[in-house]
Amino acid sequence: MSVEQSLLGKETQYPTSYQPDVLFPIARAQSREKYAHIQGITQGKDWWHVFEISWLNAHGIPQVAIGRITLPASSPNLIESKSLKLYFNSLNFTQFDSTQSFIETVEKDLSAAAGAKVELTLFQVDDLEISKPQGICIDDLMPERLEQHPDATLLKLDESGEEIEVELYSHLLRSNCPVTGQPDWGTVFIRFKGKKPCYRSLLAYIISYRQHNGFHEQCVEQIFADIWQNLQPEKLMVYATYTRRGGLDINPCRVSDLTWMPKPIRLARQ
Protein backbone atom coordinates (compact mmCIF):
# COMPACT_ATOMS: atom_id res chain seq x y z
CA MET A 1 0.00 0.00 0.00
CA SER A 2 1.18 3.53 -0.74
CA VAL A 3 1.56 6.15 1.96
CA GLU A 4 -1.10 8.25 0.22
CA GLN A 5 -3.63 5.60 1.28
CA SER A 6 -2.66 5.93 4.94
CA LEU A 7 -4.51 7.93 7.60
CA LEU A 8 -1.69 10.48 7.94
CA GLY A 9 -3.04 14.02 7.72
CA LYS A 10 -6.66 12.83 7.56
CA GLU A 11 -9.45 13.29 10.07
CA THR A 12 -10.15 9.96 11.73
CA GLN A 13 -12.36 8.39 14.36
CA TYR A 14 -10.54 6.94 17.35
CA PRO A 15 -11.50 3.28 17.80
CA THR A 16 -12.92 2.07 21.11
CA SER A 17 -12.64 -1.64 20.34
CA TYR A 18 -9.70 -3.85 19.37
CA GLN A 19 -8.80 -3.20 15.70
CA PRO A 20 -5.53 -4.78 14.53
CA ASP A 21 -6.55 -4.14 10.92
CA VAL A 22 -5.96 -0.40 11.42
CA LEU A 23 -2.18 -1.00 11.28
CA PHE A 24 -0.77 0.36 8.01
CA PRO A 25 2.47 -1.20 6.68
CA ILE A 26 4.73 0.76 4.32
CA ALA A 27 7.22 -1.18 2.21
CA ARG A 28 10.85 -0.24 2.82
CA ALA A 29 12.01 -1.48 -0.60
CA GLN A 30 11.17 1.56 -2.71
CA SER A 31 13.17 4.05 -0.63
CA ARG A 32 16.07 1.58 -0.45
CA GLU A 33 16.45 0.89 -4.17
CA LYS A 34 19.38 3.26 -4.68
CA TYR A 35 21.09 2.02 -1.50
CA ALA A 36 20.80 -1.72 -2.19
CA HIS A 37 24.59 -2.09 -2.44
CA ILE A 38 25.29 -0.27 0.84
CA GLN A 39 26.48 -2.49 3.66
CA GLY A 40 24.37 -1.91 6.77
CA ILE A 41 21.22 -0.38 5.25
CA THR A 42 19.21 -3.40 6.44
CA GLN A 43 21.24 -3.92 9.63
CA GLY A 44 19.96 -2.34 12.80
CA LYS A 45 16.76 -1.59 14.65
CA ASP A 46 13.90 0.87 14.75
CA TRP A 47 13.05 1.54 18.39
CA TRP A 48 9.73 3.18 19.16
CA HIS A 49 8.73 4.55 22.55
CA VAL A 50 4.98 4.47 23.11
CA PHE A 51 3.91 6.76 25.95
CA GLU A 52 0.15 6.25 25.70
CA ILE A 53 -0.35 2.54 26.36
CA SER A 54 -3.40 1.42 28.31
CA TRP A 55 -5.54 -1.71 28.50
CA LEU A 56 -7.90 -3.39 30.98
CA ASN A 57 -6.80 -6.17 33.30
CA ALA A 58 -8.84 -9.29 34.06
CA HIS A 59 -10.98 -7.28 36.51
CA GLY A 60 -11.65 -4.46 34.03
CA ILE A 61 -9.27 -2.04 35.77
CA PRO A 62 -7.24 0.25 33.46
CA GLN A 63 -3.51 -0.43 33.28
CA VAL A 64 -0.88 1.99 31.96
CA ALA A 65 2.74 1.61 30.90
CA ILE A 66 5.41 3.00 28.61
CA GLY A 67 6.36 0.67 25.79
CA ARG A 68 9.49 0.14 23.74
CA ILE A 69 8.90 -1.52 20.39
CA THR A 70 11.86 -3.13 18.63
CA LEU A 71 11.43 -3.50 14.88
CA PRO A 72 14.29 -5.07 12.88
CA ALA A 73 15.67 -2.96 10.03
CA SER A 74 15.58 -6.11 7.90
CA SER A 75 11.76 -6.23 8.04
CA PRO A 76 10.08 -5.72 4.64
CA ASN A 77 7.75 -3.08 6.10
CA LEU A 78 7.82 -0.22 8.54
CA ILE A 79 4.56 0.73 10.28
CA GLU A 80 2.99 4.13 9.67
CA SER A 81 2.94 6.07 12.93
CA LYS A 82 -0.66 7.33 13.01
CA SER A 83 -1.97 3.82 12.40
CA LEU A 84 0.16 2.60 15.31
CA LYS A 85 -1.30 5.30 17.56
CA LEU A 86 -4.84 4.29 16.53
CA TYR A 87 -4.00 0.63 17.12
CA PHE A 88 -2.86 1.27 20.69
CA ASN A 89 -5.94 3.43 21.29
CA SER A 90 -8.09 0.49 20.17
CA LEU A 91 -6.68 -1.52 23.08
CA ASN A 92 -7.72 1.00 25.76
CA PHE A 93 -11.03 -0.71 26.46
CA THR A 94 -9.95 -4.29 25.74
CA GLN A 95 -9.65 -6.75 28.62
CA PHE A 96 -6.66 -9.11 28.95
CA ASP A 97 -6.14 -11.97 31.38
CA SER A 98 -2.57 -10.85 32.08
CA THR A 99 0.08 -8.32 31.10
CA GLN A 100 1.87 -11.10 29.23
CA SER A 101 -1.28 -11.76 27.20
CA PHE A 102 -1.37 -8.06 26.26
CA ILE A 103 2.31 -8.15 25.20
CA GLU A 104 1.83 -11.29 23.12
CA THR A 105 -1.19 -9.82 21.33
CA VAL A 106 0.68 -6.63 20.45
CA GLU A 107 3.77 -8.52 19.29
CA LYS A 108 1.64 -10.79 17.09
CA ASP A 109 -0.20 -7.89 15.45
CA LEU A 110 2.88 -5.72 14.88
CA SER A 111 4.89 -8.66 13.56
CA ALA A 112 2.14 -9.39 11.04
CA ALA A 113 2.19 -5.77 9.83
CA ALA A 114 5.99 -5.52 9.69
CA GLY A 115 6.53 -8.94 8.13
CA ALA A 116 9.14 -9.79 10.78
CA LYS A 117 9.33 -10.47 14.50
CA VAL A 118 8.59 -7.35 16.55
CA GLU A 119 9.20 -7.17 20.30
CA LEU A 120 7.43 -5.10 22.96
CA THR A 121 9.01 -4.26 26.32
CA LEU A 122 6.87 -2.54 28.96
CA PHE A 123 8.15 -0.10 31.60
CA GLN A 124 6.42 1.29 34.65
CA VAL A 125 5.62 4.94 33.99
CA ASP A 126 8.47 6.15 36.25
CA ASP A 127 11.09 3.65 35.09
CA LEU A 128 12.19 4.76 31.60
CA GLU A 129 15.22 6.83 32.52
CA ILE A 130 16.50 9.86 30.63
CA SER A 131 20.06 9.48 29.32
CA LYS A 132 22.69 12.07 28.49
CA PRO A 133 24.29 11.90 25.03
CA GLN A 134 27.78 10.43 24.89
CA GLY A 135 30.48 11.60 22.50
CA ILE A 136 31.50 14.91 20.96
CA CYS A 137 28.79 17.48 20.23
CA ILE A 138 29.50 19.27 16.93
CA ASP A 139 26.73 21.88 17.16
CA ASP A 140 28.99 24.83 18.00
CA LEU A 141 31.16 24.46 14.90
CA MET A 142 30.93 26.80 11.91
CA PRO A 143 30.06 25.03 8.63
CA GLU A 144 31.84 26.27 5.52
CA ARG A 145 28.57 26.43 3.55
CA LEU A 146 24.89 25.74 4.15
CA GLU A 147 22.37 24.07 1.86
CA GLN A 148 18.58 23.85 2.08
CA HIS A 149 18.28 20.18 1.10
CA PRO A 150 20.44 17.06 1.64
CA ASP A 151 23.71 17.42 -0.24
CA ALA A 152 26.24 14.62 0.05
CA THR A 153 28.93 16.78 -1.56
CA LEU A 154 29.11 18.65 1.74
CA LEU A 155 30.79 15.63 3.34
CA LYS A 156 34.58 15.91 3.45
CA LEU A 157 37.49 14.16 5.12
CA ASP A 158 39.75 16.06 7.48
CA GLU A 159 42.96 17.28 5.87
CA SER A 160 45.06 15.54 8.52
CA GLY A 161 44.40 12.08 7.07
CA GLU A 162 44.37 10.78 10.65
CA GLU A 163 42.83 7.35 11.36
CA ILE A 164 40.35 7.57 14.23
CA GLU A 165 37.41 5.96 15.97
CA VAL A 166 34.97 8.57 17.29
CA GLU A 167 31.34 9.12 18.27
CA LEU A 168 29.82 12.47 17.37
CA TYR A 169 26.35 13.86 17.87
CA SER A 170 24.19 16.81 16.88
CA HIS A 171 20.86 18.05 18.21
CA LEU A 172 20.22 19.99 14.98
CA LEU A 173 18.56 17.28 12.90
CA ARG A 174 15.27 18.49 11.45
CA SER A 175 13.22 17.07 8.60
CA ASN A 176 9.57 17.07 7.55
CA CYS A 177 6.91 14.38 7.43
CA PRO A 178 6.49 13.67 3.69
CA VAL A 179 2.69 13.53 4.00
CA THR A 180 1.69 16.24 6.50
CA GLY A 181 4.71 18.54 6.19
CA GLN A 182 5.00 18.69 9.99
CA PRO A 183 8.57 19.13 11.27
CA ASP A 184 10.39 16.22 12.89
CA TRP A 185 13.16 17.07 15.37
CA GLY A 186 15.93 14.78 16.51
CA THR A 187 19.40 14.15 17.82
CA VAL A 188 21.67 12.13 15.54
CA PHE A 189 24.63 10.05 16.72
CA ILE A 190 27.41 9.07 14.31
CA ARG A 191 30.02 6.54 15.35
CA PHE A 192 32.82 6.36 12.82
CA LYS A 193 36.02 4.36 12.34
CA GLY A 194 38.37 5.27 9.51
CA LYS A 195 39.99 8.39 8.12
CA LYS A 196 38.90 11.35 10.23
CA PRO A 197 35.90 13.21 8.81
CA CYS A 198 35.74 16.98 8.79
CA TYR A 199 33.38 17.65 11.67
CA ARG A 200 32.23 20.96 10.20
CA SER A 201 31.24 19.21 6.99
CA LEU A 202 29.23 16.63 8.94
CA LEU A 203 27.36 19.40 10.72
CA ALA A 204 26.64 21.18 7.43
CA TYR A 205 25.30 17.92 6.01
CA ILE A 206 23.00 17.32 9.01
CA ILE A 207 21.69 20.89 8.81
CA SER A 208 20.90 20.38 5.11
CA TYR A 209 17.97 18.12 6.08
CA ARG A 210 15.96 21.00 7.55
CA GLN A 211 13.56 21.21 4.59
CA HIS A 212 13.79 17.58 3.50
CA ASN A 213 10.62 15.48 3.31
CA GLY A 214 11.22 11.95 4.54
CA PHE A 215 10.16 9.46 7.16
CA HIS A 216 12.50 9.09 10.14
CA GLU A 217 13.77 5.69 9.00
CA GLN A 218 14.42 6.92 5.46
CA CYS A 219 16.36 9.95 6.67
CA VAL A 220 18.64 7.80 8.83
CA GLU A 221 19.26 5.40 5.95
CA GLN A 222 20.10 8.27 3.59
CA ILE A 223 22.52 9.76 6.14
CA PHE A 224 24.12 6.34 6.61
CA ALA A 225 24.43 5.73 2.86
CA ASP A 226 25.85 9.17 2.06
CA ILE A 227 28.50 8.93 4.79
CA TRP A 228 29.38 5.38 3.77
CA GLN A 229 29.81 6.28 0.10
CA ASN A 230 31.50 9.66 0.48
CA LEU A 231 33.74 9.16 3.53
CA GLN A 232 34.30 5.40 3.14
CA PRO A 233 34.70 4.43 6.81
CA GLU A 234 35.73 0.97 7.95
CA LYS A 235 32.78 0.89 10.35
CA LEU A 236 29.78 3.17 10.76
CA MET A 237 26.76 3.63 13.02
CA VAL A 238 24.01 6.22 12.52
CA TYR A 239 21.36 6.45 15.26
CA ALA A 240 18.70 9.17 15.49
CA THR A 241 16.47 9.83 18.49
CA TYR A 242 13.47 11.82 17.30
CA THR A 243 11.17 13.82 19.55
CA ARG A 244 7.69 12.65 20.41
CA ARG A 245 4.58 13.25 18.35
CA GLY A 246 1.16 11.81 19.13
CA GLY A 247 2.51 9.87 22.09
CA LEU A 248 5.19 8.13 19.99
CA ASP A 249 8.86 8.69 19.27
CA ILE A 250 10.86 6.85 16.61
CA ASN A 251 14.54 6.00 16.95
CA PRO A 252 16.11 4.32 13.89
CA CYS A 253 19.65 2.91 14.04
CA ARG A 254 21.74 1.46 11.22
CA VAL A 255 25.15 -0.20 11.58
CA SER A 256 27.73 -1.61 9.20
CA ASP A 257 28.84 -4.07 11.90
CA LEU A 258 26.38 -5.67 14.32
CA THR A 259 28.95 -5.44 17.12
CA TRP A 260 28.37 -1.67 16.98
CA MET A 261 24.66 -1.88 17.85
CA PRO A 262 24.08 0.54 20.75
CA LYS A 263 21.59 0.10 23.55
CA PRO A 264 18.39 2.11 23.03
CA ILE A 265 18.19 5.34 25.02
CA ARG A 266 15.71 8.11 25.77
CA LEU A 267 16.96 11.71 25.72
CA ALA A 268 15.60 14.75 27.56
CA ARG A 269 13.74 16.11 24.52
CA GLN A 270 11.82 12.86 24.28
Swiss-Prot record:
EC identifiers of the protein: 1.7.1.13
Residues annotated to bind NADPH: S81, K82, R245, G246
InterPro entries per UniProt: GTP-CH-I_C/QueF (IPR043133), NADPH_dep_7-cyano-7-deazaG_red (IPR050084), QueF (IPR029500), QueF_N (IPR029139), QueF_type2 (IPR016428)
Major enzyme class: oxidoreductase
Cellular compartments annotated: Cytoplasm
GO cellular component: cytoplasm
Catalyzed reactions: 7-aminomethyl-7-carbaguanine + 2 NADP(+) = 7-cyano-7-deazaguanine + 2 NADPH + 3 H(+)
Catalytic residues of the enzyme: C177, D184
Keywords (A to Z) from UniProt: Cytoplasm, NADP, Oxidoreductase, Queuosine biosynthesis
A GO biological-process term: queuosine biosynthetic process
Sequence positions that bind substrate: I79, E80, S81, H216, E217
Pathway: tRNA modification; tRNA-queuosine biosynthesis
GO molecular function: preQ1 synthase activity
Function (record text): Catalyzes the NADPH-dependent reduction of 7-cyano-7-deazaguanine (preQ0) to 7-aminomethyl-7-deazaguanine (preQ1).
Quaternary assembly: Homodimer.
NCBIfam families per record: QueF
Family stated for the protein in its record: Belongs to the GTP cyclohydrolase I family. QueF type 2 subfamily.
Protein name in the entry: NADPH-dependent 7-cyano-7-deazaguanine reductase
Species, as recorded: Acinetobacter baumannii (strain AYE)
Gene: queF
